[in-house]
């Protein structure tokens, strides 16, 4: 075999190796995403009759939108679960890259991503396209089903042991419940007065549902409208 043939052979081997790795990670991530989807659907089916007995009508629905997206609606909130179709490698400066788990096998640093977004249900119901949503959790899954979550508060703190933590039905249920509880406790706060005090005639003439005044949950704000600078 001449030198050119050897280079071509090495190239094909590299293509097969990297492609096979990414396909393995992709299918493992899709399996995990489908388990999230299945458990969300089951949660609604098993409890919707109980929710119907509440004093007022409450939103409690599951809806499948595609192979890579589903929505879980409850109360005034929506959780959107979205799986990215591509596979990613962790950045070299990421803390996980310093662990023996990754140093022993670099292919473990490749993973799929599952995003969990929180939106207000009314934002979709009334087509308020300027409303804000928040990424409350991002799940990184590798080919061995090891995972960690980058997320808000307890979501990110509870699930960040990548070297040892593996996804299964039990951990998926725990993550799902944590995401719902976090959303329930992440309340809508009154927007800062300075952001609201000036409104155009056009905005006032438009229906309230279509106004370009954003509505979204806030992590908090300082009341500054009446403060005088010293």
Q: Can you annotate each of these PLM segments?
A:
Residues 57, 61-145, 150-157:
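Hydrophobic-cavity lipid-handling domains and compact docking modules
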Residues 19, 23-34, 158-169:
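Short, charged/polar micro-motifs that form catalytic or ligand-binding hotspots
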Residues 137-230:
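Glycine-rich, aromatic-bearing surface loops/beta-hairpins
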Residues 8-15, 47, 179, 204, ...:
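Generic structural signal of hydrophobic/aromatic residues within well-ordered alpha-helices
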Residues 1-22:
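N-terminal, Lys/Arg- and Ser/Thr-rich interaction peptides
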């Amino acid at each position: 075999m001449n030198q050119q043939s050897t280079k071509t052979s090495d190239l094909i081997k590299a293509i097969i190796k990297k492609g096979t790795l990414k396909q393995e990670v992709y299918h493992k991530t899709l399996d995990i995403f489908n388990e999230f989807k299945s458990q969300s659907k089951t949660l609604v089916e098993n409890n919707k009759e109980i929710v119907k007995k509440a004093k007022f009508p409450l939103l409690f629905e599951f809806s499948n939108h595609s192979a890579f997206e589903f929505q879980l609606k409850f109360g005034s909130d929506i959780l959107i679960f979205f799986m990215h179709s591509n596979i990613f490698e962790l950045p070299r400066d990421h803390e996980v890259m310093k662990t023996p788990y990754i140093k022993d096998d670099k292919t473990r640093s490749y993973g799929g991503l599952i995003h969990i977004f929180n939106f207000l249900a009314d934002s979709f119901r009334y087509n308020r396209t300027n409303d804000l949503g928040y990424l409350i959790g991002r799940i990184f899954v590798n080919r061995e089903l090891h995972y960690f979550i980058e997320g808000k508060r307890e979501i990110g703190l509870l699930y960040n042991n990548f070297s040892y933590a593996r996804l299964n039905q039990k951990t998926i249920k725990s993550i799902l419940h944590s995401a719902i509880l976090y959303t329930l406790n992440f309340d809508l706060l009154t927007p800062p007065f300075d952001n609201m005090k000036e409104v155009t005639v056009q905005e006032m003439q438009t229906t309230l549902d279509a106004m370009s005044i954003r509505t979204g949950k806030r992590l908090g704000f300082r009341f500054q409208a009446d403060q005088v600078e010293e």
